[in-house]
């Protein structure tokens, strides 16, 4: 590392360590050298401080959609006291009203299409979404949004028509064949996915008609759709509480969890390898929590730089 960069990084690390209220630079020790000695002693094969900071910066930008998505899922599905809770996984919740400014989990919801929402757990088996026949004059849609925040498919009047139909939603690890009766298969890149239904409200007196359409929306595991025995349930997950303040310091702990359910695509292999090198995600050789204080301070600095880019 160039001497001037070393001095600058040392000063930044000391500032970051002091900011989180921990000792580290009061004896004028070189935090970069201290980290190298600590990692060697602990046999942790972590990159150098400067590289760790760069990985954290890139990883923050890459991982932010996953963490924001987890925050919405936590409020809608996992925390019954969130004030935004809708329903457990693989259950549909119908809103018999339009969204207002008080509905804060999603930044910009529509105000003229009452929502029906379902968060899908696709780990054990695919899920079938069934829609009724809808008057062609009435707009409706089902937007499929995965943990990467990719919109990977639409069902509805403009995309698939207004006729009744059954649609298969599959996770990234599913290898089965399309069963009879399925109109189309949609592939999520993550194990968990949001299905957001929108049904047009024509005027204030139209809500009973909207509710009748909503009553026709169904979600079933594939085994139930086929009248077959269900496969073994997916393992329970120890979901961490989502807290916007904690995210500021524990962002990569949340990302480490989220990456378990988001297999890397070919275009993600490079950043995933970098994250694994600092103890985050599949393929890691040590736990993120085992990093030295100096490396964690470098990660905080990298996060701040990444935040400036988004």
Model-derived features with residue positions:
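A compositional/structural signature for long, glycine/proline-rich flexible linkers
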Residues: 27-310
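Bacterial N-terminal signal peptides that target proteins for export
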Residues: 2-12
